Amino acid sequence: PIVLVVSGIHAGEVEGKEGCLMLARDLLARGGSLGGDDILARLTLVIAPLFNPDGNDRIDPGNRRLHLPKLEGQLGPASGVGTRVNAAKINLNRDYMRHESVEMRLLQTRVCQAWQADLTIDNHATNGSVHRFSMTYDVPHTVESGRPEPIVYVRERLLPPVTEALKKNHGLDAGWYGNFVEDEAALEKGDVDPRAPVREGWMTYPHHPRFGSN
């Protein structure tokens, strides 16, 4: 199987960019703790570590400024982060169907079509918006998104123990990407309180094919 990892589509969401390079380093280190030789004998790993380089380099302290009532922004770094969009002001994570950007056209023709990956991992981070969980994750929600076997495997077998390990080893709470209903409703009033009790449930975004995660 071929696994494609795409990171850095939104500048400022740097965890995936750093993490996938660390993974590649550890896999290529002979005798590493990850058993790199064994893993790479069974799959091909294709990594696009920084899909939005122009946005990544447009660093400014005003980008992603923290604003809790609107559930947006992030804390630090003091020097600022890059922009969510590319140099042409296109949100690349809304361009998977249109192919308006040069970056997306090249990714599709030279990476996606060339490698025909069996599984794609799209690395984002929620430090551009405020959530109650320290870490969030997601899988496609529709049957049209791909084969059900990997979706069910990730949802039911892979992520539950990852969630438990994060809590046990690092004290971090993790959950599905989205927000609580109370938080979303309070956005219209501009008075979100992340400490308010949760009673009405949880909601997520519409899983349209223009998003890379679908």
Tell me the role of every PLM-derived stretch.
Residues 1-214:
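Structured catalytic-domain cores with a bias toward divalent-metal coordination
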